[in-house]
Regions:
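A short pre-motif secondary-structure segment
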Residues: 125-129
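Sigma70-family region 2
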Residues: 2-3, 39-57, 76-78
Length: 193
């Protein structure tokens, strides 16, 4: 098949490196692993550069490979019986860190931590929908899944994310009230002892 588009490797890397890294980071929750995945994706793209037919095809291909490599990395971790979420909390101190900061100051970090707790398929669908602004049909194509399955993952993922966010917010309010009470020497906010 002949086509007029001539891919430029450096230009494609420049244009898409942040997208590929961001997808890998949101899927794995691990910055170092996301960097490795992004590097692997671009090395593979270099080997398949002649097969890319257009700029849109290159973007689609990069998203698909980034999502697949991220899923592979998560599966390898599971096989080694490493609980990724506990590891993330231990490495990055998410629980202690989020409890110590004001709610609004770290909303992005809190959302990232909650997103990381979702099942892989739901997390993938949400990341592609809300980070990449893809339609359910485009997500289905990227993940090689039926559209109905993608819509289900989106619906269930949002429902689970909302439930976990509500629970997290209640826990934050409870911790904050307890801390404020201790700081006030046992005096409640309405002045009662």
């Amino acid at each position: 098949m002949t086509h007029d588009w001539q891919p430029d490797f450096e230009q494609l890397v420049e244009e898409h490196q942040s997208m590929v890294f961001s997808l890998a980071l949101r899927m794995t929750g691990d910055r170092g692993l996301a960097e490795e995945i992004a590097q692997d994706v671009f090395m593979e793209m270099d080997r398949h550069l002649g097969k890319l037919e257009s700029a849109a095809h290159a973007t689609f291909w990069l998203r698909r490979v980034a999502m697949n490599r991220s899923a592979d990395a998560l599966r390898r971790r599971r096989v080694r019986r490493v609980d990724l979420w506990v590891e993330i909390e231990e490495q990055h101190g998410l629980r202690a860190e989020t409890a110590a900061r004001p709610l609004g100051a770290s909303m992005g970090a809190r959302l990232e931590a909650l997103l990381a707790t979702l099942p892989e398929a739901q997390r993938a669908a949400l990341v592609l929908r809300y980070q990449e602004d893809l339609t359910p049909e485009e997500i289905a194509s990227t993940l090689a899944a039926p559209v109905a399955t993608v819509k289900s993952h989106l619906q269930r993922g949002l429902k689970l994310l909302r439930a976990r966010a509500a629970s997290h917010l209640k826990e934050y309010v409870r911790e904050r009230s307890s801390r404020d009470s201790r700081l006030m020497g046992g005096v409640s906010s309405d002045g009662r002892v």
